[in-house]
């Protein structure tokens, strides 16, 4: 099936509404905060099979607003921001050419488990480059993911080198392909969302540390909630469009709340005393490097903006700090306490909540 047909089918297929998802609050919060501030650095979602990981990610993308892009550009170039433009678009603007502008939904790109590095990064047609003297570049998935979300299911089963490539691009916002002395770069600023089942193996600590957040989800045990989830799904499958209509108002409200939070974010204040306490917690937990401190500061500001406030409270920090630090702790086989609970315990002591 060609790409155009696939895309139209994807757009025609109704998506389960984000606000209809029952439970899994930790995962939903981590995703929303990454959309408010993509510099948080993505999220790794670990949990049992069938707990709605991919459903929730797709639902979030459906919730997000449309963005302006250059119409005939495969990199989703932003017509106003040079940092998010391909070299070709930048060149056209420098030559004072008019570029066609259109709007489109923020895209979510799925990374297949068996994808090669060429499929992910793109390829250079060396023969064409040598014979015609042009940089013939075939964009990969990273180009398609620019200004969107890159979703990797079962990321713990992906080749380590490929995970490294994804994390490098997510951190720098650029993808560079080099072949036979020819180098091509393009913007690749995306939110990286990985998911996996811990029974199938963990990511190496060096890779795990580079995800901004780590959400843990489990199968819902409460019988009443399970019944509610099953009924929701059955109602959606029976009449998806009517089901989506039921949640139209709550979807619009959440979408607006996220947009307002993004606009408010630059004004958020995090007290010096709180920043010191965050760093003290990281130090006491023996967290390597400063990523934990940085991400916790960013996430605390993002949640305050989501709540419509301009100042971060200790409660904001308490809600996000397990997400930001649990995957950065050194594993002790003799310790039975959950890593998230360990972070909360240290937080309570440092902030005087005991």
Curated annotation (Swiss-Prot):
Q: Name one GO biological process term.
A: photosynthesis
Disulfide feature: 282-324
InterPro entries on file:
AAA+_ATPase, CHLI-like, ChlI/MoxR_AAA_lid, Mg_chelatase_ATPase-isu, Mg_chelatse_chII-like_cat_dom, P-loop_NTPase
Which cellular component, as a GO term, is one annotated location? chloroplast stroma
Q: What influences the activity of this protein, per its activity regulation comment?
A: Redox regulation; active in reducing conditions, inactive in oxidizing conditions. Thioredoxins f and m mediate the reversible reductive activation of oxidized CHLI.
In Swiss-Prot or TrEMBL terms, this protein is called Magnesium-chelatase subunit ChlI
Q: Which UniProt keywords apply?
A: ATP-binding, Chlorophyll biosynthesis, Chloroplast, Disulfide bond, Ligase, Nucleotide-binding, Photosynthesis, Plastid
- Entry-linked Gene3D superfamilies: Magnesium chelatase subunit I, C-Terminal domain, P-loop containing nucleotide triphosphate hydrolases
Q: How does it assemble?
A: The magnesium chelatase complex is a heterotrimer consisting of subunits CHLI, CHLD and CHLH.
Tell me yes or no: is Chloroplast among this UniProt entry's keywords.
yes
Q: Which gene encodes it?
A: chlI
Q: What class of enzyme is it?
A: ligase
Its taxonomic path starts at: Eukaryota, Viridiplantae, Chlorophyta, core chlorophytes, Trebouxiophyceae
Q: What is its main location?
A: plastid
UniProt cross-references to SMART domains, sorted A to Z = AAA
The organism encoding this protein is Chlorella vulgaris
EC number(s) given by UniProt: 6.6.1.1
This protein's pathway reads: Porphyrin-containing compound metabolism; chlorophyll biosynthesis
Q: Which family does it belong to?
A: Belongs to the Mg-chelatase subunits D/I family.
Annotated ATP binding sites? 47-54
Per the entry, what this protein does is: Involved in chlorophyll biosynthesis. Catalyzes the insertion of magnesium ion into protoporphyrin IX to yield Mg-protoporphyrin IX. The magnesium-chelatase is a complex of three subunits, CHLI, CHLD and CHLH. The reaction takes place in two steps, with an ATP-dependent activation followed by an ATP-dependent chelation step.
């Amino acid at each position: 099936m060609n790409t155009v047909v696939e895309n139209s089918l994807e757009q025609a297929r109704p998506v389960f509404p984000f606000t209809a998802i029952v439970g899994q609050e930790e995962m939903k919060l981590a995703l929303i905060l990454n959309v408010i501030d993509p510099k948080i650095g993505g999220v790794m979602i670990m949990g049992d099979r069938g707990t709605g990981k991919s459903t929730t990610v797709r639902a979030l993308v459906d919730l997000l607003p449309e963005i302006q892009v250059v119409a005939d550009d495969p990199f989703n170039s932003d017509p106003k921001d040079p940092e998010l433009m391909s070299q070709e678009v930048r060149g056209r603007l420098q030559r004072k050419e008019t570029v066609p502008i259109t709007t489109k939904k923020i895209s979510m790109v799925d990374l297949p488990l068996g994808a090669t590095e060429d499929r992910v990064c793109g390829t250079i047609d060396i023969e064409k480059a040598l014979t015609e003297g042009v940089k013939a570049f075939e964009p990969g998935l990273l180009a398609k993911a620019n200004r969107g979300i890159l979703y990797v299911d079962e990321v713990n089963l992906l080749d380590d080198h490929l995970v490294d490539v994804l994390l490098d691009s997510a951190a720098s916002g650029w993808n560079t392909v080099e072949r036979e002395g020819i180098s091509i770069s393009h913007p690749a600023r995306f939110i990286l969302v990985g998911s996996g089942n811990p029974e199938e193996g963990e990511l190496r600590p060096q890779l795990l540390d580079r995800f901004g957040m780590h959400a843990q989800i489990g199968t819902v045990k409460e019988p009443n909630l399970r019944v509610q989830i099953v009924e929701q799904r059955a109602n959606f499958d029976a009449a998806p469009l009517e089901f989506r209509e039921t949640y139209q108002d709550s979807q619009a409200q959440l979408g607006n709340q996220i947009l307002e939070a993004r606009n408010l974010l630059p004004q958020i204040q995090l007290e010096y005393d709180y920043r010191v306490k965050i760093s003290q917690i990281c130090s006491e937990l023996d967290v390597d490097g400063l990523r934990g401190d940085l991400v916790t500061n960013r996430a605390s500001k993002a949640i305050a903006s989501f709540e419509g406030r301009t100042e971060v409270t200790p409660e904001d920090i308490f809600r996000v700090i397990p997400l930001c630090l649990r995957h950065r702790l050194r594993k002790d086989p003799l310790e039975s306490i959950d890593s998230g609970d360990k972070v909360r315990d240290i937080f309570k002591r440092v902030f005087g909540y005991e």
